[in-house]
């Protein structure tokens, strides 16, 4: 029997009394970023198709309900000036604004604002209220609209309701069901930690570490009060230029988005931030997932506290106009503090009619305000030029903003093939990485015969297909084999693609493409499949690798070279290659690439084993090629990896000899990207499965399945 008052259940990993199993070994390789590919957390089941549900959606009715909601103020969280537009726009902005181009992670594509840590970032204070306001609509339309789509649609409809002609909107974002484990948000240990201390994201002359875009832990972009909270518009302008560039925005888009975001709505800081309760993830259970609750003062409407800044930016904060630039450029601004103590600017000698009215009482006029980021648009010479142009041409500003808003909210959706709905714009935009449709009606057998007779080696064919497809990122759906951009700048010159070998192989494929009416993109994949079929047959397995036709060939004019630079692989453990030595270990780099490609730990394992014995290492390296039958698709890598007749001896930072225990003779060489599959307990478990005598055929079949997944990852149709 247990003593009275003792806990009657075993403490799980979600309690303060227990750590996760791996917490005892913090330096051990953490495979959690690959395990999140599991579908067990998804309540919709494997047969659910969001695209099919979208086809049932009454878009017109949804838009009407959304517009009605915007002006239906609720007592528990009243709308400023009777319109929730500003709140919904901020929610959508902050959902999309977490995107960064370096790894394609973040952004609005998954509805991740519902989960930690994003739902509890200081910069997202009170956006939980926006999502709760949307709940009646989500409840009504159910599976036919994802949270991810609904949040972005809410912001877009809000702009339309206030007078902006938007550029378009696409449905198609699918929800996740748990926090993302793969996104590195920074190493700071406290919210809004200033730069320069332990774990700072900055080094040298304020160099922001990759892949980060935001300037502080818990912010979406820059600190509105100034760098590290110290007002200095010119320094803030430098931060803005870096941050927005890492969100794929140029100077004009930066000014447009900042001004357009501040044309409507207001900031809230009319009170004491100390009165706010904890963020949602730390809030008491009776708050039911709401955070920042104020039980000490009124805390809503004109008395709400969110960012700590207080006031509207424009005279008419519920309508789309050029009021932002009118106030910013036509008045001088002085530094002051909000009632909550935040640094902000107020205009000098402002006309009474230029002041916005109070959110609750239209007979009261209030002082507008600007942040350090707003004043930066006036003080920075380049931003000032753009601001002046927008000020003089509202139509141009509106058009530029509408396109920038569309880019901001759709950048992580990938190519246009993933778009859905009646408001998808017809115009092709270069940041969408456009790809023309490819031919489907050609004689595949004739093409295969020509490839086989071309003189290309199995390694040439498999390697070229892999290099073409490996650029795919499941984060923002960019890259991949479709488009055959491996033959265009910048990819054709990337070190990891071995340009000389690549040019030789592509010359053969281009000739075959012209003769047979097949795209180069399809030819590359078909060649890789042929190589695998040949290697499997040499091992005694007569298989056919699945092939899907229809890939198109992009041209250089469709390719933004600078935009594609971020896709360059700096390491590829599947080909046992590092461009140079990094602080991060080779096995961690392998995990990151695996996760971006949308692969599981099991798929990574079987692919590594197959790629090694096929002889596809970079530069023909023999490291990790644990077989006497290179070029034969066999499970030899795993058989020899798990063989206790061998010892592993380090010979350098990332090099090892595999030595026979009895003779001390070196049998093979390896890297950390090889050893990890025998060292890590989880990966070794997979390796042992494939090393078994009765799983030789399973290995071949699983390798082909994983290979096909990689080759087809970007075929969204």
Swiss-Prot record:
<dbReference type="InterPro" id="IPR000763">
    <property type="entry name" value="Catalase_peroxidase"/>
</dbReference>
<dbReference type="GO" id="GO:0046872">
    <property type="term" value="F:metal ion binding"/>
</dbReference>
<dbReference type="Pfam" id="PF00141">
    <property type="entry name" value="peroxidase"/>
</dbReference>
<keyword id="KW-0349">Heme</keyword>
<comment type="subunit">
    <text>Homodimer or homotetramer.</text>
</comment>
<keyword id="KW-0732">Signal</keyword>
<keyword id="KW-0479">Metal-binding</keyword>
<feature type="site" description="Transition state stabilizer">
    <location>
        <position position="90"/>
    </location>
</feature>
<feature type="active site" description="Proton acceptor">
    <location>
        <position position="94"/>
    </location>
</feature>
<feature type="binding site" description="axial binding residue">
    <location>
        <position position="262"/>
    </location>
    <ligand>
        <name>heme b</name>
    </ligand>
</feature>
<keyword id="KW-0575">Peroxidase</keyword>
<feature type="cross-link" description="Tryptophyl-tyrosyl-methioninium (Trp-Tyr) (with M-247)">
    <location>
        <begin position="93"/>
        <end position="221"/>
    </location>
</feature>
<protein>
    <recommendedName>
        <fullName>Catalase-peroxidase</fullName>
        <ecNumber>1.11.1.21</ecNumber>
    </recommendedName>
</protein>
<dbReference type="InterPro" id="IPR010255">
    <property type="entry name" value="Haem_peroxidase_sf"/>
</dbReference>
<dbReference type="InterPro" id="IPR002016">
    <property type="entry name" value="Haem_peroxidase"/>
</dbReference>
<feature type="signal peptide">
    <location>
        <begin position="1"/>
        <end position="12"/>
    </location>
</feature>
<comment type="similarity">
    <text>Belongs to the peroxidase family. Peroxidase/catalase subfamily.</text>
</comment>
<dbReference type="GO" id="GO:0004096">
    <property type="term" value="F:catalase activity"/>
</dbReference>
<dbReference type="GO" id="GO:0042744">
    <property type="term" value="P:hydrogen peroxide catabolic process"/>
</dbReference>
<keyword id="KW-0560">Oxidoreductase</keyword>
<keyword id="KW-0376">Hydrogen peroxide</keyword>
<dbReference type="InterPro" id="IPR019794">
    <property type="entry name" value="Peroxidases_AS"/>
</dbReference>
<comment type="function">
    <text>Bifunctional enzyme with both catalase and broad-spectrum peroxidase activity.</text>
</comment>
<dbReference type="GO" id="GO:0005829">
    <property type="term" value="C:cytosol"/>
</dbReference>
<feature type="cross-link" description="Tryptophyl-tyrosyl-methioninium (Tyr-Met) (with W-93)">
    <location>
        <begin position="221"/>
        <end position="247"/>
    </location>
</feature>
<keyword id="KW-0408">Iron</keyword>
<dbReference type="GO" id="GO:0020037">
    <property type="term" value="F:heme binding"/>
</dbReference>
<dbReference type="GO" id="GO:0070301">
    <property type="term" value="P:cellular response to hydrogen peroxide"/>
</dbReference>
